[in-house]
UniProtKB/Swiss-Prot annotation:
A single GO cellular-component term on record: cytosol
Protein name: Methionyl-tRNA formyltransferase
Listed EC numbers: 2.1.2.9
Function: Attaches a formyl group to the free amino group of methionyl-tRNA(fMet). The formyl group appears to play a dual role in the initiator identity of N-formylmethionyl-tRNA by promoting its recognition by IF2 and preventing the misappropriation of this tRNA by the elongation apparatus.
Keywords from the named record: Protein biosynthesis, Transferase
NCBIfam families attached to this UniProt entry: fmt
EC class (word): transferase
Similarity remark: Belongs to the Fmt family.
Amino acid sequence: MIKLLFMGTPQFSATVLKGLLDNPAYEILGVVTQPDRAVGRKKDIKVTPVKQLALEHGISIYQPEKLSGSQELIEIMGLGADGIITAAFGQFLPTLLLDSVSFAINVHASLLPKYRGGAPIHYAIMNGDKEAGVTIMEMIKEMDAGDMVAKASTPILETDNVGTLFEKLAIIGRDLLLDSLPAYLSGELKPIPQDHSQATFSPNISPEQEKLDWTMSNQEVFNHIRGMNPWPVAHTFLEGQRLKIYEAQLAEGEGLPGQVIVKTKKSLVIATGQGALSLIVVQPAGKPKMSIIDFLNGIGRKLEVGDIIGR
C-alpha cells in the first residue's frame, strides 16, 4: 500500500481525494487544506470540502495559514508518506517537503503549459476556448512547470460555466490520476517536459476583473459572465448599486454599450459593443439571486428603453 499525503481545498480537490480513498492501493496519512474561513454576512465558519471529507474518514487534518516554516510542516514530514498528491491546494510547497518524499504529483485543471496558476477554468471560459482539460504533472518549485505525466481534454460547451466545468474536470482529473499513477510509479510511464516557451498564466481573479465591460462584443461579455459563475460573479452597476449577473443569453440588437434596448415583462436586453445580451439571472445589491422576471417586477421596474447601466 502506497502511503500518501493529500493537499487540496475546493470540491475539485475533494473529488480527487475521494477517488484515492476508494482505491485500496493507497493510504491517506493526512490532508493539508486551507484554514476555515468566515463567510457571508453572518460570518459563518466554513470548512473546505477537503476537510469535510477528511473528517468523515477520520483522517488527520492540517490547516496552516502558510506551510513554509510552520509547526505543521514538521508534523507532516514526520508522517512518513511515500508521496504527495496535490489538487488545487492554493499554496506553494516548500522544497524541504518536496525533497522529503519519493514523488510529488499535482492534478492541474488545464492543458499545460497553457494556464499555469490558480484560475485556469475561469480563463478558459472567459477567453472563449473550445476545450479544457487536466494535466497530471510532477511538482517542482516553479509554479505548474513540472514534467507532464498525463493529459485529458473535454469540450467547453456554450452552456458551461465555471461550476459545471469544475465538476467535469474534477471527475476527469480523478480518473486520469488513478489510471496513470500506477504506471508512473512503476517507471513504465515517462513524464514529458513542458514547452516553457508556450506557457501562459491564469492568476487569481482580481476584483477589477469582475466588472463587466459593455463595450466588448456580446460573445465576449457572455463568456465573461460564464467565466465568473458561480464565483466570484460578474457585475455591473445600476444607479450606483452593484448588480450581479449570473446568467445571460446572446441576443440581437444595437445600441450604446450598456443601453437597455428591449424591456418587456419577461425580458431585459442590453446592448454591447457588438450585438446584445438578454439577462436571465441577476442579483441586486442586498437581495437574493433572482430571475429577470422577478427583477423586472421589483427593482428593475424603473428601467426604461434607452437607459444605460454600468455607470
